[in-house]
Design a protein with these regions (language model features):
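Loop/turn elements at helix/coil->beta-strand transitions in domains of secreted/extracellular proteins
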Residues: 86-88, 120-123, 146-147
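A short beta-strand-turn-helix
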Residues: 59-89
């Protein structure tokens, strides 16, 4: 599976055996004391940490327990990860004030449109950070983003991601059990996201 993914993405590989993960990119997967998760814990929302596009992929037997993330969508609907049971879930942490987030949005929308049109068992959910509801809604409408997003709740939702959202943007691909199967720290391209989602879909139930 790993060799198949590497060939598709055509980027350098760093094996992190202790973590049971495959990190693809120019730097190792790591946490940062100034990360948005750390800011969420401290209540400090002064800035953000921008990632370099590092990709981490976890084999099925190396994945942790399902996420318990929950929140309220920008439309006011309660939502939780368990609602996406038996579907591959893509979570994207974003803010309209974040340049890399804005740049990657069309790529996320492209993949979402293609997968939903094909009837694939996939759900996308944005996780907004630091925007008011009206500001976030206006941004999504202006950019024709059709998948939903959770409201910012002062960073509490980010804490449910267990330190996996260390940069803005961060994209997580969860398997059908709600476990993190892949992470992109920084902007993600349509080709990369499509490849990651396809690999998780190919695992079956």
């Amino acid at each position: 599976m790993a060799a198949k993914l590497v060939g598709r993405l055509a980027v350098p590989v760093i094996l992190t055996m202790a973590a049971g993960a495959i990190c693809l990119g120019v730097s190792a997967c790591s946490s940062d004391a100034g990360s948005i998760a750390a800011q969420a814990r401290s209540g400090d929302g002064k800035g953000y940490v921008s990632g370099d596009g590092t990709i981490e992929r976890l084999a099925p037997d190396q994945r942790s327990s399902p996420l318990t993330l929950s929140g309220t969508t920008l439309a006011g609907t309660a939502w939780k990860v368990a609602d996406a049971k038996n579907r591959v879930l893509v979570l994207n942490v974003w803010g309209q004030w974040c340049g890399p987030c804005v740049a990657e949005m069309p790529h996320l929308q492209q993949v979402w449109s293609q997968l939903s049109a094909a009837g694939r068992p996939v759900q996308f959910m944005g996780v907004n950070y630091r925007d008011g509801v009206q500001t976030a809604q206006a941004f999504l409408r202006a950019n024709k983003i059709t998948y939903p997003s959770l409201q910012d709740d002062g960073g509490r939702t980010l804490l449910s991601l267990r330190g996996k959202a260390n940069t803005t943007p961060t994209t997580l691909v969860l398997d059908r059990q709600g476990r993190i199967a892949a992470r992109v720290s920084g902007p993600v391209s349509a080709a990369t996201l499509s490849a990651l989602v396809s690999d998780v879909l190919s695992e079956g139930g």
